Amino acid sequence: MSTIDSPAIGTATINAVSVDCPAKTNLTLHVGPSHAEWGGRHELDTIYCAVGVYDTVTATRKAPGSGFSLNLEGAYLGDLASSGSDMRRNHAVLALFAMAEASSHEPDVALNIDKRIPVGAGMAGGSADAAATILALNTLWDLDWPIERLQEVAATLGADMPFCLTGGYARGTGFGERIEQLDDDGDIVRDLTERGFTGHLLVGAYRAELRTPEVYATFDQIGAGDGDENHLQKAAVSLHPRSGQAIEEALRAGASQAFVSGSGPSVIAFVPTEDAADAVQRAWQDSRCVDRIIATNAPARPIVHITA
């Protein structure tokens, strides 16, 4: 569940809300057949885990009738920085319009996104931005909607978005949008913890991006790898071989688990000790199999700040 951090504001109008929303990975990702009634999307059974790499979305109230605006900042914007990028297709903007329609508000809001989550990386950066926008507007517009209602809006936008509203651990079914929150002390999470899927981790990130439809199309052709908990890993590695090298290097250096995150190409390496973390980082640097290394922890959850 998200955390709200705010000063005492009484009945004053809220003018700006910032949300730090974490990335996600899939500790397991089992892919079933595609369904025409889902627009060709595949049936999924997955364990989501929120990872402590955060995008920050700030939603600021604008004058009535002035419309929306979008500003992106960050050192690793990828294709989002392209002059040809259509801001109306940005996930946060889509979330703004979906919330405006659902709540009968005008979308007179300035959105600023400070991106730290790798773009096109299988870590739901766009979904995190949409979820952050939904959480911010729930506070900015004083809706006070329960998380279940927010998830209904999020589910119309994409599979990962309902999970990104809460973070932590969850099981996703359907095409990923049906969320069952998992207790940190429950049997499923306890089993994953015993297998090394928790705690400190390293993210191996890349300048290259993978498009999710391309990865699924490749999966449809070649299927899943034997024993892969992520059924998309074989397809992602076939399209981006450096991810496979990063997995091998991490496991050889002492990672408890290493795998492609979602549809890739980012690689997650859980490291049980500080020595293992140092060894994996050195292995990745020496082999140049990743472009950027991010050290963090899991699980993580969104944080809402009332800023003005």
Curated annotation (Swiss-Prot):
Q: Which reaction does it catalyse?
A: 4-CDP-2-C-methyl-D-erythritol + ATP = 4-CDP-2-C-methyl-D-erythritol 2-phosphate + ADP + H(+)
Pathway per its UniProt entry is: Isoprenoid biosynthesis; isopentenyl diphosphate biosynthesis via DXP pathway; isopentenyl diphosphate from 1-deoxy-D-xylulose 5-phosphate: step 3/6
Residue numbers binding ATP = P118, V119, G120, A121, G122, M123, A124, G125, G126, S127, A128
User: What are the protein's GO molecular function terms?
Assistant: 4-(cytidine 5'-diphospho)-2-C-methyl-D-erythritol kinase activity; ATP binding
Location of the active site: K24, D160
What biological processes does GO assign it? isopentenyl diphosphate biosynthetic process, methylerythritol 4-phosphate pathway; terpenoid biosynthetic process
Which sequence ranges form a coiled-coil region, renumbered to this chain? none
Entry EC number(s): 2.7.1.148
Instruction: Name the Pfam families on file.
Output: GHMP_kinases_C (PF08544), GHMP_kinases_N (PF00288)
The alphabetized UniProt keywords are: ATP-binding, Isoprene biosynthesis, Kinase, Nucleotide-binding, Transferase
Report the InterPro entries cross-referenced here.
GHMP_kinase_C_dom (IPR013750), GHMP_kinase_C_sf (IPR036554), GHMP_kinase_N_dom (IPR006204), IspE (IPR004424), Ribosomal_Su5_D2-typ_SF (IPR020568), Ribsml_uS5_D2-typ_fold_subgr (IPR014721)
Protein family per UniProt? Belongs to the GHMP kinase family. IspE subfamily.
> Which PANTHER family does the entry mention?
4-DIPHOSPHOCYTIDYL-2-C-METHYL-D-ERYTHRITOL KINASE, CHLOROPLASTIC
Q: What does this protein do?
A: Catalyzes the phosphorylation of the position 2 hydroxy group of 4-diphosphocytidyl-2C-methyl-D-erythritol.
For this entry, the protein name equals 4-diphosphocytidyl-2-C-methyl-D-erythritol kinase
- Species name for this entry? Bifidobacterium adolescentis (strain ATCC 15703 / DSM 20083 / NCTC 11814 / E194a)
Gene for this protein?
ispE
